[in-house]
């Protein structure tokens, strides 16, 4: 609809056609009609207010006893969904933690395979004796980040040999101190 068509539509509401007669009431009639109009407007307003639906108080009101009863039923229903970790089969866990992978990377790209084994929760022993020092440092930095991300640990167990363990493997003792003591005793 165009702008002019809308204008014509609305102007028809407010304009009185020439054919209609308009009576101008006397002042006396206006004074008598004014209180009647006010009274009818007030009645209309009151009826409009009465027509607004009232909220049912009983629908929203609950006692604390009902609320507690609902919460206890809710917690009872949800307790069936809880699985305790003690019920996990110990054989599967021991098989995962009992496997150790040995790696001797030749290039930095071999580090991805080591990280994959760590993500699969397997301990890895990494021998960096056959790689240049710069690449060895990059590999250790990468593996340190991987071990940190999975919550594991990395330990030096020999010259350029590192043990990387995931969170399900615990290493007791330390070989590094013993190796350093042995090296100093040969001097």
From Swiss-Prot:
<dbReference type="InterPro" id="IPR038594">
    <property type="entry name" value="SepF-like_sf"/>
</dbReference>
<feature type="region of interest" description="Disordered">
    <location>
        <begin position="21"/>
        <end position="97"/>
    </location>
</feature>
<feature type="compositionally biased region" description="Polar residues">
    <location>
        <begin position="70"/>
        <end position="97"/>
    </location>
</feature>
<comment type="subunit">
    <text>Homodimer. Interacts with FtsZ.</text>
</comment>
<dbReference type="GO" id="GO:0000917">
    <property type="term" value="P:division septum assembly"/>
</dbReference>
<keyword id="KW-0717">Septation</keyword>
<comment type="function">
    <text>Cell division protein that is part of the divisome complex and is recruited early to the Z-ring. Probably stimulates Z-ring formation, perhaps through the cross-linking of FtsZ protofilaments. Its function overlaps with FtsA.</text>
</comment>
<keyword id="KW-0132">Cell division</keyword>
<dbReference type="GO" id="GO:0005737">
    <property type="term" value="C:cytoplasm"/>
</dbReference>
<comment type="similarity">
    <text>Belongs to the SepF family.</text>
</comment>
<protein>
    <recommendedName>
        <fullName>Cell division protein SepF</fullName>
    </recommendedName>
</protein>
<keyword id="KW-0963">Cytoplasm</keyword>
<keyword id="KW-0131">Cell cycle</keyword>
<dbReference type="Pfam" id="PF04472">
    <property type="entry name" value="SepF"/>
</dbReference>
<dbReference type="InterPro" id="IPR023052">
    <property type="entry name" value="Cell_div_SepF"/>
</dbReference>
<dbReference type="InterPro" id="IPR007561">
    <property type="entry name" value="Cell_div_SepF/SepF-rel"/>
</dbReference>
<dbReference type="GO" id="GO:0043093">
    <property type="term" value="P:FtsZ-dependent cytokinesis"/>
</dbReference>
<feature type="compositionally biased region" description="Polar residues">
    <location>
        <begin position="38"/>
        <end position="63"/>
    </location>
</feature>
């Amino acid at each position: 609809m165009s702008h002019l068509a809308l204008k014509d539509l609305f102007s028809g509401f407010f304009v009185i056609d020439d054919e209609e007669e308009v009576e101008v009431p006397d002042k006396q009639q206006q004074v008598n009609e004014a209180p009647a109009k006010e009274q009818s407007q007030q009645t209309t307003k009151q009826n409009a207010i009465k027509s607004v639906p009232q909220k049912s108080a009983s629908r929203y009101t609950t006692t604390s006893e009902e609320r507690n009863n609902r919460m206890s039923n809710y917690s009872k229903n949800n307790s069936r969904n809880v699985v305790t970790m003690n019920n996990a089969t110990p054989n599967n866990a021991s098989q995962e933690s009992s496997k150790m992978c040995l790696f001797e990377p030749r290039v930095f790209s071999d580090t991805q395979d080591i990280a994959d084994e760590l993500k699969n929760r397997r301990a890895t022993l990494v021998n960096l004796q056959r790689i240049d020092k710069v690449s060895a440092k990059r590999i250790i930095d990468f593996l340190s980040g991987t071990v940190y991300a999975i919550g594991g640990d990395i330990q030096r167990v020999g010259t350029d040999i590192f043990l990387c363990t995931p969170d399900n493997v615990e290493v007791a003792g330390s070989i590094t101190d013993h190796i350093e003591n042995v090296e100093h005793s040969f001097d």
